[in-house]
């Protein structure tokens, strides 16, 4: 026996330690972090399950009146969602509200408390016995992308944080419970754990839970293997104390034992940890050559696995693993197992457990990485049994295959996808029984034609392993007008539907006046048996009574259908009226707001005008300009123009002085003649001529004085070609 095998045997024989006397430290532990009720997400896409279509099971509601609970989709059922690690939804599943497969949503956690351990800090203790495969707690924290994860790893390492709180949700999403999380963060590591982590699809998100690996006793510490999906900045010594302890946990460089496949994956691949350890022992040299230190699985081992076709018991394991796995090597092996499966009944089971939806997501995830993988998936889809196109349509896989056919450059993929689309195009949609049609009522139909009415209160999930043959009702009678029959592959029975009325039922519809039961086809001729009180009248009465009852039942059905239609129409009308009312209210509100805005604007403008008017009225009016000032202004417009020609000789300053003196003289003359007469707006030509003549006379006198005074200077300038004199006007 190898050392590894001996450790495994010791681990199995090991009696777990109980912490019944340890003090409850839950409140104290809660003070060390911020407790979250739900995971938070750094973006909308972070932590996405990748399942854009809702995964619905095919179970029926199973109401327990004593417990007042819907017991559908329980642990012992064959709910296709539960076996593939998908939680049911009240909104989309047909199993009724609040089924047993909503443990994450309802927070159905085990009874646990936090305790103080000797070497490992806080730990999580079971307060009562926990049975195998039970949901213990959800691992909650901040869901971040890979870039943020890398940054936080460095940051926490710098801050010397030694505890591990990162969990890999998927290859690009990580849960960080370092600062914010739930009590699940206190689960310690063990090399021989009593629990394991598993990823479940809940709505549009992938969530992580801790589940019991075996029966857990009251007082046991709950532990799982940190080396599966959990990360820390540095490797740490392990203090689990188990016989098979590998001494170290976490860090970038994983030990061989740390790279063992998770339980669900190894089962789906059809291998055991014992086989994997044996392979590691024999091929240890391959690890350093064929994979990097960042790998989280033994890649060489996965590639070496020789897979086989699926058995019936393998279906849920493989499909559940395929829905959650992101590693290409593992995906290739899982697809290979489905590819090797040729049994139609097993392939039908694969289709039932979300086969089309799962392969659709696999194609989307790896279409650019592995053409051979996509080719195998298309071949698998082509060989699957096809009766209707219902599941093909609901999974939206047809659009994915069309995308391959349109955009792929590979001729083989184009042909496979084209052939598959052509084959799917020939299929028809099957009419489905609407949800909750008569599920909560026993059939009111009388036991006619020698058979009992079909019970409607069926178990939500059919028993596993029972293959029911199609049940065909043998009768020569034609169906009533408007009724048609169809076969339901899920229940292997016929059902009846009326397309015009939009109703369906399990019981065969009968005409308003049903025929009596048929007798045997070939009875031997014999003497009639005489019975007391048995005559033709009595038999006729029974038939008439049955006919009357059946007519009343049909009448009630029609009345109920009519009332239902009226109710729907009334509700629709109410919705329309409500919508119209809301629209009118919205318009009215918008108009009101618009008017209020206009009124406010008017008030603002009026206030502005009022302020402006007030400011203007506060300024005193300017005093009237005196008459002499008005004459000054009038003459000042013309005199400078008359003197401009003298500027070259006497200069600008002298011109300004002459103009000022001349205007002053003219104003004095006007004021002397007519002191009360204002000047006209414009002077006439005669007036302007007089001003011009007077200006000339004034300047002639000024020039005589100016020239006389500057004779000597002017003589000097004339000798050097200097200042030129103004040519006198010729009269």
Swiss-Prot record:
<dbReference type="GO" id="GO:0006353">
    <property type="term" value="P:DNA-templated transcription termination"/>
</dbReference>
<comment type="similarity">
    <text>Belongs to the class V-like SAM-binding methyltransferase superfamily. Histone-lysine methyltransferase family. SET2 subfamily.</text>
</comment>
<dbReference type="GO" id="GO:0005634">
    <property type="term" value="C:nucleus"/>
</dbReference>
<feature type="domain" description="SET">
    <location>
        <begin position="110"/>
        <end position="227"/>
    </location>
</feature>
<dbReference type="InterPro" id="IPR006560">
    <property type="entry name" value="AWS_dom"/>
</dbReference>
<feature type="region of interest" description="Disordered">
    <location>
        <begin position="708"/>
        <end position="731"/>
    </location>
</feature>
<dbReference type="InterPro" id="IPR013257">
    <property type="entry name" value="SRI"/>
</dbReference>
<dbReference type="GO" id="GO:0045128">
    <property type="term" value="P:negative regulation of reciprocal meiotic recombination"/>
</dbReference>
<keyword id="KW-0175">Coiled coil</keyword>
<dbReference type="InterPro" id="IPR035441">
    <property type="entry name" value="TFIIS/LEDGF_dom_sf"/>
</dbReference>
<dbReference type="InterPro" id="IPR001202">
    <property type="entry name" value="WW_dom"/>
</dbReference>
<feature type="region of interest" description="Disordered">
    <location>
        <begin position="510"/>
        <end position="552"/>
    </location>
</feature>
<feature type="compositionally biased region" description="Basic and acidic residues">
    <location>
        <begin position="541"/>
        <end position="552"/>
    </location>
</feature>
<dbReference type="GO" id="GO:0005829">
    <property type="term" value="C:cytosol"/>
</dbReference>
<dbReference type="GO" id="GO:0009302">
    <property type="term" value="P:sno(s)RNA transcription"/>
</dbReference>
<dbReference type="Pfam" id="PF17907">
    <property type="entry name" value="AWS"/>
</dbReference>
<keyword id="KW-0804">Transcription</keyword>
<feature type="coiled-coil region">
    <location>
        <begin position="539"/>
        <end position="618"/>
    </location>
</feature>
<dbReference type="Pfam" id="PF00397">
    <property type="entry name" value="WW"/>
</dbReference>
<dbReference type="InterPro" id="IPR036020">
    <property type="entry name" value="WW_dom_sf"/>
</dbReference>
<dbReference type="InterPro" id="IPR017923">
    <property type="entry name" value="TFIIS_N"/>
</dbReference>
<dbReference type="GO" id="GO:0003723">
    <property type="term" value="F:RNA binding"/>
</dbReference>
<protein>
    <recommendedName>
        <fullName>Histone-lysine N-methyltransferase, H3 lysine-36 specific</fullName>
        <ecNumber>2.1.1.359</ecNumber>
    </recommendedName>
</protein>
<feature type="compositionally biased region" description="Basic and acidic residues">
    <location>
        <begin position="460"/>
        <end position="475"/>
    </location>
</feature>
<dbReference type="Pfam" id="PF08236">
    <property type="entry name" value="SRI"/>
</dbReference>
<dbReference type="InterPro" id="IPR050777">
    <property type="entry name" value="SET2_Histone-Lys_MeTrsfase"/>
</dbReference>
<dbReference type="InterPro" id="IPR001214">
    <property type="entry name" value="SET_dom"/>
</dbReference>
<feature type="region of interest" description="Disordered">
    <location>
        <begin position="436"/>
        <end position="487"/>
    </location>
</feature>
<dbReference type="GO" id="GO:0140955">
    <property type="term" value="F:histone H3K36 trimethyltransferase activity"/>
</dbReference>
<feature type="region of interest" description="Disordered">
    <location>
        <begin position="606"/>
        <end position="628"/>
    </location>
</feature>
<dbReference type="InterPro" id="IPR046341">
    <property type="entry name" value="SET_dom_sf"/>
</dbReference>
<dbReference type="GO" id="GO:0030174">
    <property type="term" value="P:regulation of DNA-templated DNA replication initiation"/>
</dbReference>
<dbReference type="InterPro" id="IPR038190">
    <property type="entry name" value="SRI_sf"/>
</dbReference>
<dbReference type="GO" id="GO:0030437">
    <property type="term" value="P:ascospore formation"/>
</dbReference>
<keyword id="KW-0678">Repressor</keyword>
<feature type="domain" description="WW">
    <location>
        <begin position="477"/>
        <end position="511"/>
    </location>
</feature>
<comment type="function">
    <text>Histone methyltransferase that trimethylates histone H3 'Lys-36' forming H3K36me3. Involved in transcription elongation as well as in transcription repression.</text>
</comment>
<dbReference type="InterPro" id="IPR044437">
    <property type="entry name" value="SETD2/Set2_SET"/>
</dbReference>
<dbReference type="GO" id="GO:0006354">
    <property type="term" value="P:DNA-templated transcription elongation"/>
</dbReference>
<feature type="compositionally biased region" description="Basic and acidic residues">
    <location>
        <begin position="716"/>
        <end position="731"/>
    </location>
</feature>
<feature type="compositionally biased region" description="Basic residues">
    <location>
        <begin position="607"/>
        <end position="616"/>
    </location>
</feature>
<dbReference type="InterPro" id="IPR003616">
    <property type="entry name" value="Post-SET_dom"/>
</dbReference>
